[in-house]
Amino acid sequence: EQHANPNFAQRVLADQNLTLIGEELFASYGASIDFRKNPVTESFIASIAEDARELGLQYDVYPSVMIAQAILETGSGGSLLSKAPYDNLFGIKGWYNGNSVSMKTREDDGTGNLYQITAAFRNYPNFRASLTDYVSLIRGGTGYNQTFYQGVWRSEANNYLQATAFLTGRYATDTSYNNKLNSLIAT
């Protein structure tokens, strides 16, 4: 059976015979959020995909996870923070080469309750700098723990599902972060 519209096509198999490993992964798959492909998202992906692929290979990071994070963090490149002159694709706080911008953001208290704060976010000269800084953070960790994001590395995570699960509660306070990323990757 095939469903199609101008912006999205999906093939649904009537019988999905999965291997035991596949069934186990499928059971743990948290893609519960319905994202749809659209021209804005497709254009945004095209603007960062090649850099994400190159940097992912170079730094041992899943490009699909990187792209999904950028889509989620920026609303497909539509957020003020992601537009020039800020070019911050990942909502990374702090300073980049001495540059930052203060903006309001919502945080999750770890139980699903949201609250608002004003935070300093890194200000980049372009998307490539934002992507490069992101993989440097994922590979270099935090100032107090260089292996803080080690579970996201391709050499440590068997698949992108494990990588996104590891990011939840570490990279983002959103308790559904991995489900959202998984849904974006599956789309």
Predicted region positions:
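Catalytic cores of secreted/periplasmic lytic hydrolases that degrade extracellular macromolecules
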Residues: 1-187
